[in-house]
Amino acid sequence: MFMGEYHHNLDSKGRLIIPAKFRVEIGDKMIFTRGMEGCIFGYPIEEWQKIEAKLAKLPLTKRSARKFTRLFYSGAMESEFDKQGRVNLTMTLKEHAALIKECVIVGVSNRIEIWSAERWNDFSEEANENYDDIAEDLDDIEL
């Protein structure tokens, strides 16, 4: 399980360090793809395979299913960590998440999310203001 918030910068070659705590659970490589709300999703291989199985069941007759899978898979890449625990994300993913220098890596249960620091700050500020309302909307899970 991934949790926590970590701040790292892209290096001069555009590589990003993935926190050691996350790498222990991930292994030597993971899959990155376009995430929601302008971030990048990162999945361990086992989690990615579960998602692939679910997406394979979507009906090709549904336009939204076709659009989503095209975007989700076309933005995906497999990346191995180098000896320092860095990954080199594609330009497509960096542009999707507006990654320039300062990044925030967030653990979200079965995945990690990579955000530009600016987008993360905007998201967190807005979400924190509405935290109680968001929790109330999820009352059926009984936390």
Curated annotation (Swiss-Prot):
GO terms for cellular component: cytoplasm; nucleoid. Keywords: Cytoplasm, DNA-binding, Repeat, Transcription, Transcription regulation. Residues 5-47, 76-119 form the SpoVT-AbrB domain. Its main location: cytoplasm. GO terms for biological process: negative regulation of DNA-templated transcription initiation. The keyword Cytoplasm applies. InterPro entries: MraZ, MraZ_C, MraZ_dom, MraZ_N, MraZ_sf, SpoVT-AbrB_dom, SpoVT-AbrB_sf. GO terms for molecular function: DNA-binding transcription factor activity; transcription cis-regulatory region binding. It is found in: Cytoplasm, Nucleoid. PANTHER family: TRANSCRIPTIONAL REGULATOR MRAZ (PTHR34701:SF1). HAMAP family: MraZ (MF_01008). Belongs to the MraZ family. Forms oligomers. This is Transcriptional regulator MraZ.
